[in-house]
UniProtKB/Swiss-Prot annotation:
Keyword Transmembrane helix in annotation: no
EC number: 5.4.2.11
Organismal lineage: Bacteria, Pseudomonadati, Pseudomonadota, Alphaproteobacteria, Hyphomicrobiales
Name the record gives this protein: 2,3-bisphosphoglycerate-dependent phosphoglycerate mutase
InterPro entries, per database record: His_Pase_superF_clade-1 (IPR013078), His_PPase_superfam (IPR029033), PG/BPGM_mutase_AS (IPR001345), Phosphogly_mut1 (IPR005952)
Keywords of the record: Gluconeogenesis, Glycolysis, Isomerase
Catalysed reaction equations from the record: (2R)-2-phosphoglycerate = (2R)-3-phosphoglycerate
NCBIfam families per UniProt: pgm_1 (TIGR01258), PRK01295.1 (NF002339)
Enzyme class: isomerase
């Protein structure tokens, strides 16, 4: 057995609450989001997991989630690396729009295609494939080597950046990954083999 990878989608943001496309915009966590992030920390602690290093995007909702988790674990000064590579998918022209308003403007079917297709981006934005093209190389270069040294690594990021990791770790197709839901504030724990394959996966829902 090698190391452990803990993936956490940030707690609910103010814009999740308002049903807005967020992408690279930078709203804070909602009241529930702060609670979800703290709860994620408790779930990790209850499993006896103790991160050796943390990674997060440069967006505040992920950074604050990471901070809450580390505070619960008694590790407020843990080394944390922030990188734009872990940012949420860029929704381009949809960013900041209410999802219902976007459906009125472009049509329900078109918005559904942009949201749930693997390789069709919204205007000025990224597809899930585009997101994976920056997330996965970063994982291979920066995160995986830490795990293969036997470390426990915490990654606090976003629905689509984490989907991009789960797609490869779980061996999912583009069609399958767009249907995968990643809940806010629910840790996903992967234990990796020395050859970087997945030995086990556990979702800490309880």
């Amino acid at each position: 057995m090698s190391g452990t990878l803990i993936l956490v989608r940030h707690g609910q943001s103010e814009w999740n609450l308002k049903n807005l496309f967020t992408g690279w915009r930078d709203p804070g966590l909602s009241e529930l989001g702060h609670e979800e992030a703290t709860s994620a920390g408790r779930k990790i602690k209850d499993r006896g997991l103790r991160p050796d290093i943390a990674f997060t995007s440069v967006l505040s909702r992920a950074k604050v989630t990471n901070t809450h988790i580390l505070e619960v674990l008694g590790l407020p000064a843990l080394e944390t690396i922030e990188d734009v590579a872990l940012n949420e998918r860029d929704y381009g022209d949809l960013s900041g729009l209410n999802k219902d308003d976007a459906r009125k403007k472009w049509g329900e079917e078109q918005v559904h295609i942009w949201r749930r297709s693997y390789d069709i981006p919204p205007p000025g934005g990224e597809s899930l494939r585009d997101t994976g093209a920056r997330v996965w190389p970063y994982y291979l270069r920066e995160i995986l080597p830490q795990v293969l040294r036997g470390k426990t690594v915490l990654v606090s990021a976003h629905g689509n950046s984490l989907r991009s990791l789960a797609m490869v770790l779980d061996g999912l197709s583009g069609e399958e990954i767009v249907k995968m839901e990643i809940a806010t504030g629910v840790p996903i724990v992967y234990r990796l083999n020395p050859d970087s394959t997945v030995a086990s996966k556990e979702i800490l829902e309880g």
